[in-house]
Amino acid sequence: MTDQRKGSDAEPTTHFGFKNVPESQKAEKVAEVFHSVAAKYDLMNDVLSGGMHRLWKRFTIELSGVRTGNRVLDIAGGTGDLAAKFSKLVGPTGQVVLADINGSMLKVGRDRLLDKGVAGNIEFVQADAEKLPFPDNHFDCVTIAFGLRNVTHKEDAIRSMLRVLKPGGRLLVLEFSKPTNALMSKVYDTYSFAFMPLMGKLITNDAESYRYLAESIRMHPDQETLKSMMVEAGFDRVTYHNMTSGIVALHRGIKP
């Protein structure tokens, strides 16, 4: 699946929510969204998921296979939920890199983890998932939670993640996906396009950012499509686990 389409002037375009925009503008528009929501990102995660995001992330950690001494890269790591847990798992002989393209999110994550006193083995790096600034065959595990849908060229990002993994290393992609039954799909549509923007307006005074987030979820590849993208990028043994009736899916692949 490609993210590129051609407009009438032959300029490459891609989706930003339901809108079609020049590729060169998407990253800037996504950045504006996350600059806006960074300060209350954790609160909104709890409100909008009813706290379920913590269970989804816990399952991700369980399937990661991360252990003492490992190197872990958490892409789009935002406010540091996964990084904090991985920091404890890898211990003082391991390393966690929390990477995010958005400076505001990275600052919130750094400040939050420093306040918790768990940042001793965590490095904070502002980085683009499509062009990761790390050596080949460097990490034992790479994770990206609720970030891949915001990437312009998803195939490039997945290949970049493959490159930085060691042979036998694991990629875990936690992302909103396609509900597995029609009733849940209808309920989820109402929730996404009515409740999410309303809560965004009430809590952050920003309905538009949460309208974009709802739209971006609908534009993200479904479970089977993302699995195929990971296989085509070069990953082996790609599987996925649906959670909460497919509202969220966790994909896992191994570097040969």
Swiss-Prot record:
UniProt EC number: 2.1.1.163, 2.1.1.201
Pathway field: Quinol/quinone metabolism; menaquinone biosynthesis; menaquinol from 1,4-dihydroxy-2-naphthoate: step 2/2; Cofactor biosynthesis; ubiquinone biosynthesis
Sorted UniProt keywords: Menaquinone biosynthesis, Methyltransferase, S-adenosyl-L-methionine, Transferase, Ubiquinone biosynthesis
InterPro entries assigned: SAM-dependent_MTases_sf, UbiE/COQ5_MeTrFase, UbiE/COQ5_MeTrFase_CS
Keyword ATP-binding in annotation: no
Record: residues binding S-adenosyl-L-methionine: T79, D100, D128, A129
One Pfam family per UniProt: Ubie_methyltran
The protein's enzyme class: transferase
Catalytic activity: a 2-demethylmenaquinol + S-adenosyl-L-methionine = a menaquinol + S-adenosyl-L-homocysteine + H(+); a 2-methoxy-6-(all-trans-polyprenyl)benzene-1,4-diol + S-adenosyl-L-methionine = a 5-methoxy-2-methyl-3-(all-trans-polyprenyl)benzene-1,4-diol + S-adenosyl-L-homocysteine + H(+)
MF GO annotations: 2-methoxy-6-polyprenyl-1,4-benzoquinol methyltransferase activity; demethylmenaquinone methyltransferase activity
CDD domains: AdoMet_MTases
Function: Methyltransferase required for the conversion of demethylmenaquinol (DMKH2) to menaquinol (MKH2) and the conversion of 2-polyprenyl-6-methoxy-1,4-benzoquinol (DDMQH2) to 2-polyprenyl-3-methyl-6-methoxy-1,4-benzoquinol (DMQH2).
PANTHER family associated with the record: 2-METHOXY-6-POLYPRENYL-1,4-BENZOQUINOL METHYLASE, MITOCHONDRIAL, METHYLTRANSFERASE
Protein name: Ubiquinone/menaquinone biosynthesis C-methyltransferase UbiE
Source organism of the structure: Pseudomonas fluorescens (strain SBW25)
Higher taxonomy: Bacteria, Pseudomonadati, Pseudomonadota, Gammaproteobacteria, Pseudomonadales
Name of the gene this protein is made from: ubiE
